[in-house]
Amino acid sequence: MGKYFGTDGVRGVANTELTPELAFKLGRIGGYVLTKDKENPKVLIGRDTRISGEMLEGALVAGLLSIGVEVMRLGVISTPGVAFLTKAVSASAGVMISASHNPVADNGIKFFGPDGFKLLDEQEKEIETLLDQEDALPRPTGADLGQANDYFEGAQKYLQFLKQTVDEDFTGIHIALDCANGAASSLAPHLFADLEADISTMGTSPNGKNINDGVGSTHPEALAAFVNAKNADIGLAFDGDADRLIAVDEKGNIVDGDKILYICAKYMKEKGLLKQQTLVTTVMSNLGLYKALEALQIDTKQTAVGDRYVMEEMRKGGYNLGGEQSGHIIFLDHITTGDGMLSALQLVNIMKQTGKKLSELAEEWETFPQTLVNIRVTDKHAVTDNEKVPAVIKEVEQEMNGEGRVLVRPSGTEPLVRIMVEAKTEELCDAFVNKIADVVKAELGQE
């Protein structure tokens, strides 16, 4: 990754790392790079519910206007909503202000091209190069400056698109929604109510400061309790920008991205919709998933962690379903990025079409016990150069004797080293993780 761009755009603590000054420059330079060959360029901007969103939006808009770009403000909307609308209204580019599932202090700026896909590496590199140079970009004046307008009705256009991806309404299904006090708060309840579902909601009272705070896809235990309390048929949890989905079955069991991918891949294969009989996953997907897919004669392609890598593999190989255990699910026949609400619709639609409860769909295979820990470090990239970390990993793998696996990697978006272990029992998982974590802490230090 570059100096500014990580695996998912530019991220950092708002107002100290991701400052209004940097947002202004990103707007100005990003606007130039993405629209320099366009006539009458326009750029869409959306944001999640973070308190810093308006501050960064103001700076970003100013930068875009200063380069002569028309800006259409979408207001609070999901990341996939921005991706969809960028292509749908033939905009030159789209920008989302969000740090997804990260805490409220963080924020991020992510660009989309006119096709609704994330930027190419070379486009990000061009923006980065210009960020570090003295500003010699054009400075239009008078009537050549950009103008900004609100396009809040864009959200309705996006919801209409989502609704037409399912076969029928959801009458008779009680759905519990957890919107993470984020972008889905004003979207998901309307979407599922319009489809005649009986809905109960939580995490739908954003105040700028409570996004992802004990709610949403990174805290599915809250939704599990809510599903049980409301006696719902299914629970659907989104993250702050609604590009992820984690589900909960009617018994209160958590159904993660791996389970959702299996359910969707199996259904799509049965309906003749799964291109090349292949599912694209990441190295984080559970061993149990691969064994279950093998039994269904569904092939898998494995990528590095990050939905951008899943998408790259899907586009390269001509596949139409892929995703991550964390809940990024990509339905490439419908949209150009992971979409939590679209994934939720497909999952409920499969329940409706098969007449099965979510627990029945999810219980068709068992996951290997898996333990994941995050270690906060001063330099996450040092994990790849350190000698003692690979040594302890090798030691653990020898102890496993082929009955499990280890993955240690730097986070793409936070100052963390992530350690994942799968083994035959939870006790073994915990023991192996602790053994590796002790070495990572000792070698790389903690902030």
Swiss-Prot record:
CDD domains according to UniProt: GlmM
UniProt-listed InterPro entries: A-D-PHexomutase_a/b/a-I, A-D-PHexomutase_a/b/a-I/II/III, A-D-PHexomutase_a/b/a-II, A-D-PHexomutase_a/b/a-III, A-D-PHexomutase_C, A-D-PHexomutase_C_sf, A-D-PHexomutase_CS, Alpha-D-phosphohexomutase_SF
Processing and modification events after translation: Activated by phosphorylation.
EC number: 5.4.2.10
Key words of the record: Isomerase, Magnesium, Metal-binding, Phosphoprotein
Gene3D superfamilies for the chain: Alpha-D-Glucose-1,6-Bisphosphate, subunit A, domain 3 (3.40.120.10), Alpha-D-phosphohexomutase, C-terminal domain (3.30.310.50)
Catalytic function, reaction form: alpha-D-glucosamine 1-phosphate = D-glucosamine 6-phosphate
Molecular function GO labels: magnesium ion binding; phosphoglucosamine mutase activity; phosphomannomutase activity
CC per GO annotation: cytosol
Post-translational modification Phosphoserine, affected residues: 100
Cofactor(s) required, per the database record: Mg(2+)
A GO biological process held by the record: UDP-N-acetylglucosamine biosynthetic process
Cofactor details (free text): Binds 1 Mg(2+) ion per subunit.
Active site: 100 (phosphoserine intermediate)
Residues that, per the record, bind Mg(2+): 100, 239, 241, 243
Top enzyme category: isomerase
Family to which this protein belongs: Belongs to the phosphohexose mutase family.
HAMAP family assigned: GlmM_B
Known function: Catalyzes the conversion of glucosamine-6-phosphate to glucosamine-1-phosphate.
Protein name, per record: Phosphoglucosamine mutase
Organism: Halalkalibacterium halodurans (strain ATCC BAA-125 / DSM 18197 / FERM 7344 / JCM 9153 / C-125) (Bacillus halodurans)
Lineage, highest ranks first: Bacteria, Bacillati, Bacillota, Bacilli, Bacillales
Gene name of this polypeptide: glmM
